[in-house]
A protein has these predicted regions:
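Glycan-processing catalytic domains of CAZymes
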Residues: 2, 7-301, 305-319, 324-332, ...
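Surface beta-strand/loop "capping" patches
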Residues: 237-257, 364-399
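A generic structural signal for beta-strand entry/edge sites
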Residues: 387-391, 402, 434-438
Length: 453
């Protein structure tokens, strides 16, 4: 088991991708990419493939799906020389322990079975997630979200909470929607959606894309290289993901009060480009709230009695605590994706009332950053408390370039650089604005990171 733990520690550095071929020659497609771990089904558990992968610095992780005989599969995986096993779905603790006796294990259950308290040592992940992009109605029009702008399907709020609650490396292992052939931009969105939240998306291609890539078709290879350029962008700046979330607004939540739902309160606030720090209820402390001025306490009844003094001290210092009406419960969603259409009128009205309280308190205050002319985009602000370096990620979920974006930050900064995939860095000129300092960005195709100091 000690050896397994040593191997497992190394898996925290895995840049993962699902791989559908067991042909050693297919590994050539991973050359000059950041991918260093491949997830393969049992059909590719051949010693020849594993040996070839090891020769080019790629670890092979075997996938065991729900319903499989995991104990027997673990023995075959060990005999083939696999580095670890990935178990997807629901397995008993007894079965997982038996598999762990053979090889290190990465568990990817549904969200309801995430073990946040046990995640720090080896990482945590799930296969259950929204496919990132603008939500489109049946008629082809963009769906409006609770905030009034285009509804962005995202896992960002969920991933940010999991990072805050567990302190672990997080894998988002959702697959593309079945039966759809997707443009490469949708894969870029999936990679960016996880990366800006501090996680990693397990790269997964639809059958058409995978077929074109393995056949070395020009378009398939070009799309693959473009996707890999974006994955590399986030890996080259991995230190940014370890910066603490910045901003003066905190959201106090736990798994029982909607924190595991995509499209939940963190995502609703994020759609306004208002930076928000997730704080898990069990981690509530003055240290976690340092530097904030506003706290949204989504379910006051869930705060342990011993921690309520922290909230009282926070308010006594002149800070604002926003709480919903007594008895409010965040609507439960079986698939962990908020959908206004599936809410009862009562739940809809209650959620709308809470949202109005939040927006009325926040107003147009600059709680860390304001982003203008960016519909269909999401942002995330990171940086050390007390000023210094700040990094603002910007992700475009639309099918067109975003142009003429303006960013205002409350702190004064002397330098501003815009980092783009492919290694391009643009120097921007800061200027004084009413709320602090601002910069203008001419155009963003898919992803950018604004670094200021």
């Amino acid at each position: 088991m000690f050896l397994a733990l040593l191997l497992f520690a190394g898996l925290a550095d895995c840049v993962p991708a699902r791989w559908t071929s067991g042909d050693p020659a297919s590994l050539e497609l991973l050359k000059d990419t950041p991918v260093n771990c491949v997830l393969v089904e049992e059909g590719a558990w051949a010693r020849e493939f594993v040996t070839a992968a090891q020769g080019v610095g790629v670890r092979v992780l075997g996938v065991i799906g729900e319903g499989a005989d995991a104990r027997a599969a673990a023995g075959r995986a060990k005999a083939a020389g696999l580095a670890a096993l990935v178990i997807e779905g629901s397995f008993s603790r007894e079965v997982v322990s038996a598999v762990e006796a053979e090889l290190p294990v990465i568990a990817l259950p549904g969200r309801a079975e995430l073990r946040l308290a046990a995640g720090r040592a080896g990482g945590i992940g799930t296969t259950q997630g929204a496919w990132p992009g603008i939500r489109v109605e049946a008629e082809g029009a963009a769906s409006a979200g609770p905030t009034g702008g285009p509804w962005v399907n995202t896992n960002s709020g969920f991933l940010r909470f999991v990072r805050a609650a567990s302190g672990a490396a997080v894998w988002m292992a959702n697959r593309p929607p079945e039966g759809e052939v997707l443009r490469v931009e949708r894969y870029v969105m999936a990679a960016a959606d996880a990366a800006v939240a501090g996680g990693r998306w397990v790269v997964s291609l639809d059958p058409d894309f995978s077929k074109r890539l393995l056949a070395r078709e020009a378009r398939g290879v070009a799309d693959w290289r473009r996707l890999m350029a974006h994955v590399r962008f986030f890996e080259e700046h991995r230190e940014w993901a370890d910066l603490p979330p910045a901003g003066a607004l905190a959201v106090l939540q736990d798994a029982e009060s909607g924190a595991l739902i995509s499209g939940g309160l963190l995502d609703m606030i994020g759609a306004r480009h208002t930076p928000a720090r997730p704080v898990a209820t069990r981690h509530l402390s003055q240290e976690r709230l340092a530097g904030t001025r506003v706290l949204v306490n989504i379910e006051p009844g869930s705060v342990p009695e011993g921690a309520r003094g922290v909230l009282a001290e926070y308010e006594a210092a002149g800070n604002v605590v926003i709480a919903p009406p007594e008895g409010f419960r965040f609507p439960a969603m079986a698939d962990y994706q908020l959908s206004l259409e599936r809410l009862s009128k009562e739940d809809h009205d209650r959620l709308d009332g809470v949202w109005k309280r939040v927006t009325a308190t926040i107003g147009r205050s600059n709680l860390g950053a304001r982003v203008f002319n960016a519909p269909g985009m999401l942002s995330r602000l990171l940086g050390e408390a007390g000023g210094g370096r700040r990094v603002l990620y910007l992700v475009n979920y639309t099918d067109y370039q975003a142009e003429s974006i303006t960013v205002w930050l409350p702190e004064r900064f002397r330098k501003a650089r815009l980092h783009l995939p492919g290694g391009e860095v643009r120097e921007l000129e800061p200027y004084r604005v009413e709320e602090g300092w601002g910069v203008d960005i001419e155009v963003i195709g898919t992803v950018a990171a604004l670094e200021v100091e």
